[in-house]
Each structure stands twice: as C-alpha cells, then as structure tokens.
C-alpha cells in the first residue's frame, strides 16, 4: 500500500473519486488518498495504540487542527449567507475533510519509513510515479504542440485520470491543470532529486558508478516544469536557485583571500575587502542571470514578457496601479481572490470565518477593479464552483485567523529546523532528505500564493519524509540497548 501511495501521487483529480467527493464541482481528488487512508487505519493508528510516539513537532499541528475545528464550528454563528447554492455547514464539513486527507498523507509518510532502507525505497517508488508523469507530459508536449487541436486519443486517455481536459499549449501530466503539475515538481520531486545530486547520495545505483539517476530526473523535471508555463512554479524554482546561488556566493567569498601581505586596508584586515568585493560581484552576476532568465522566459510566454513594462500602468496611482500591473500580467483575477480573502480576515481576525467559508464574503469584499474582470463577472453571475482565496497563506488568515496562521507557520518552521539539522548530519542519505525539505519549504513560500488546498499530497509527503528522517536520525544516535549513558553528577 505504501508503494502504491507514492506511485499514485501525480494523479490529483481522479474522476471516480471526484464524483464521490462532490460531483463535477469537486476537482481535488488525489488517487493516493485511497491507499493512504487504508494505511492509516490498518497500520499507523494501530501502531500508535501499541505505544508508538507521535511524530516530532506534532503539537503545533494538532493545535492548528483544534483551531480549525473551533473556527469552523463557530462559523454557523457568523453572518454568512448562502452563496452560489452552497451553505456554511456543507462548506465547513468538506473543508475539514480535505484537511483530514492532508493529515493522513503527513502521518503515513512520517510513520512508515522507520529505517534508512525504507526511506531509500520510498524515494525509488516516488521516482517510479514521477517517471510515468514525466513520460506522459513529454508525450503531451510532442503530440499537441502550440494551438493545434489535441488528438482524441490523448484526450480520451487523459480523461481516465483527470476531470479536466488537456491544455493545448501547456503540459499537465496527470494533474488537474499545469500549475498543479508544477507544484508537484517544485515541492516534492525536484527537491528530492536536487538534494540527492548535491549530497552525492542516490537511492539508486549510479550509472557507471558516477552518474546518479537523480541528475537525469532533475534535468527532465526542469524541462517539464518550463513546459507547464506555470509562472508561480517557475518563480518557485528560481527562488530556490537564487537561495542556492546566494549561499554559494557567501561560501566562496569566505574562502577567497588575497595572498599574504596584500589587501591590508585599515580597519578591515587582510583580504576582507577583497572577499566582500568578490561576494558583491558574484551577487550582481546572480541577479543578472535571474533577470536574464525572466527575459528569456518572456520570449516563450507573452505574460512574462510584460513584467518589465511598468510605466504605462503607473498613471493609475495607488492600488489602481497595482491592479492594472497585475492585469497586464494576466494575474489580476488571482490578486482579486487574495484581496477578498484578506478583507475577510480583517473582518474576523481572531479565528477567521472557518475552513472553506472565505468565499461567502466574496461579493462584499471584491475590489471595484474586479467587477470589470471577466472571471469575476462569471462568478458573480452564478457560475459553477465557489471562490476560494487561491493562496494557502491568505486562506489560513481568512479562515483560521491569526491563531491558526501562527500555529501552522510555527509547525512549518519546526519542520524546517529539523530539515536543516538533517542536512548537516553525518548520514549521507538523511542529508538528502534534509536538503530536500529545505528546498521544498523555500519553494512553498512562493507556491503558497498559488494553491490553497489541504488535500493535495505533495507537500504533506515531503514534510512527512523529513519528519521520518528526524526519527531515524534520533534512533541512530541512541545506543543499541536504548539506555541513556549520559553521566549525571550529584553533590556528595
């Protein structure tokens, strides 16, 4: 069951599950949830009942769940009227169910890999599912280029795995839409493969003893990421690249020194000015490379090409200039969802409006600018679906308030701290997991402005693997007989 869970991660909107979850209006239906729920009920929970410890850093997570339940229960007393045919209780129940699915992914991923061998096997099974996803994405790119009509064979095959048809000029993999595929790549697969390459430790046998398979998968995955044309996904990858570049620049600057007897400048000491100069020069080069990368992407995506066109929208002034600029980038609709969610938070800052309920305030919270946007007009005229904040960070604020937001971010910080410790440890493969966790969290900072669902498995699994690695590291550091040999001193 564990292997099937990992292999099925790329399938995010399985049609039969979507029908069970809520019909055509439900798009988040990960097939991996089926083995995850079975594994939780048949193995994880029984292990807890036998006395196994809960995963590290579970306290803030359980506290967040308590806040979410309390906020959702209290939402029935708020002035939230039915909107687009949906009521508060139904929305809250469905939202809590998606959170339960996400927690299932986390706890199974944190509990099942109890040894380094299981952790390695987990990475191999993840790669099996990823190869299938990458192959299908490559087929999409090869057989449906540009604006050409999608062959019916591809369309019918894709409908077996997703409730949404393929996009003619963007790859989707097995996901609901290209941005979901990009999210899978930048918060799960690419971090693991990049971590393996940088740590020099592979879950597979190296090709000819030197070339890790993860390096090949990393290059393939980056190519597919570009073909998704997901701006947030690509920006997330660039964020990780910028952090790595800055860290490498800092370390290189520390190592570089002028030969002895040179570079002595009053008050700075030997070579310090030279080191600082090298760092600044490398940072300038890094910024230039990133800007050049954005410009190059703009040659393939007209939306990105307008990033540097600022002057025409400045005349609007104030927030109007911001909205006009985002509209120029074809991103204004997303910003409208964010602003609406933040206004809901301002009305209910302590506990929010309860999970799933931010959309009930959408009509009264939508900025005037939004009433001219086609997507907003369609929603206000009663289109199927329900408006969500479209950002995990905004959703946490709007639906769980300050308390829920702080608890969730504290939990993420704890996982990040655990990942950092793993990345600095002695066990080479645990360093892979630790580095991957850091890369995934860095990407999630940006990705949190794109997706807001709790039910998608990729982030939960990544955080669960980091937690499992922490437990394995703790077990390896204990004596074989489990006794504590730390000396204690008592006054005589």
Cite the ranges covered by each PLM segment.
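Transmembrane signal-anchor hairpin modules in multi-pass inner-membrane enzymes, especially those
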Residues: 1-81, 114-120, 124, 149-153, ...
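Membrane helix-loop boundary segments at the extracytoplasmic
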Residues: 7-20, 227-233, 390-400, 430-469
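Juxtamembrane membrane-water interface segments that cap and precede transmembrane helices
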Residues: 13-22, 82-85, 159-175, 336, ...
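Aromatic-anchored transmembrane helix interface
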Residues: 27-37, 63, 84-111, 130
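Alpha-helical transmembrane segments of multi-pass inner-membrane proteins
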Residues: 65-69, 99-108, 120-168, 172-266, ...
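A membrane-periplasm/extracellular boundary helix in multi-pass inner-membrane enzymes
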Residues: 135, 141-145, 228, 244-326, ...
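Long extracytoplasmic/lumenal interhelical loops at the membrane interface
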Residues: 324-339, 347, 351-400
């Amino acid at each position: 069951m564990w292997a099937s869970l990992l292999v099925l991660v790329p399938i995010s909107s399985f049609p039969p599950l979507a029908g069970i979850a809520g019909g055509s209006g439900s798009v988040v239906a990960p097939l991996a949830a089926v083995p995850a729920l079975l594994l939780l009920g048949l193995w994880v929970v029984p292990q807890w009942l036998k006395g196994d410890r809960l995963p590290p850093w579970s306290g803030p997570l359980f506290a967040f769940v308590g806040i979410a339940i309390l906020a959702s229960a209290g939402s029935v007393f708020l002035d939230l009227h039915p909107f687009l045919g949906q009521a508060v209780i139904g929305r809250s129940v469905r939202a809590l169910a998606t959170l339960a699915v996400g927690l299932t992914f986390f706890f199974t991923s944190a509990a099942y890999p109890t040894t380094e061998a299981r952790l390695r096997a987990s990475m191999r099974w993840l790669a099996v599912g990823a190869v299938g996803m990458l192959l299908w994405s490559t087929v999409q790119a090869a057989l449906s280029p540009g604006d050409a009509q999608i062959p019916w064979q591809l369309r019918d095959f894709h409908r077996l795995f997703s409730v949404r048809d393929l996009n003619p000029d963007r790859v989707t993999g097995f996901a609901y839409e290209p941005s979901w595929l990009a999210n899978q790549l930048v918060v799960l697969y690419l971090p693991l493969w990049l971590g393996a390459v940088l740590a020099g430790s592979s879950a597979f046998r190296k090709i000819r003893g030197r070339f890790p398979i993860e390096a090949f998968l990393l290059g393939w995955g980056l190519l597919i990421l570009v073909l998704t044309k997901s701006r947030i996904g690509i920006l997330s990858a660039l964020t990780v690249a910028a952090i790595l570049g800055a860290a490498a620049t800092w370390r290189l600057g520390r190592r570089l020194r002028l030969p002895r007897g040179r570079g002595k400048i009053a008050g700075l000491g030997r070579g310090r000015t030279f080191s600082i100069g090298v760092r600044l020069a490398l940072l300038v080069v890094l910024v230039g490379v990133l800007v050049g990368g954005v410009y190059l992407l703009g040659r393939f995506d007209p939306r990105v090409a307008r990033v540097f066109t600022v002057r025409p929208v400045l005349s609007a002034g104030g927030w109007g200039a911001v909205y006009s600029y985002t509209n120029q980038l074809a991103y204004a609709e997303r910003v409208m969802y964010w602003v609406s969610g933040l206004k809901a938070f301002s009305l209910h800052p302590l506990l929010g409006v309860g999970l799933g309920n931010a959309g009930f305030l959408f009509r009264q919270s939508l900025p005037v600018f939004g009433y001219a946007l086609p997507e907003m007009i369609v929603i206000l005229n009663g289109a199927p679906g329900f408006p969500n904040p479209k950002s995990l960070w905004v959703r946490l604020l709007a639906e769980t308030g300050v308390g829920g937001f702080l608890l969730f971010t504290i939990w993420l910080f704890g996982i990040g701290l655990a990942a950092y410790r793993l990345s600095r440890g002695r066990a080479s493969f645990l360093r892979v997991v630790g580095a991957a966790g850091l890369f995934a969290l860095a990407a999630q900072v940006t990705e949190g402005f794109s997706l807001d669902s709790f039910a998608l498995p990729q982030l939960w699994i990544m955080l669960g693997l980091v937690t499992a690695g922490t437990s394995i590291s703790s077990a390896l550091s204990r004596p074989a007989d489990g006794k504590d040999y730390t000396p204690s001193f008592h006054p005589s």
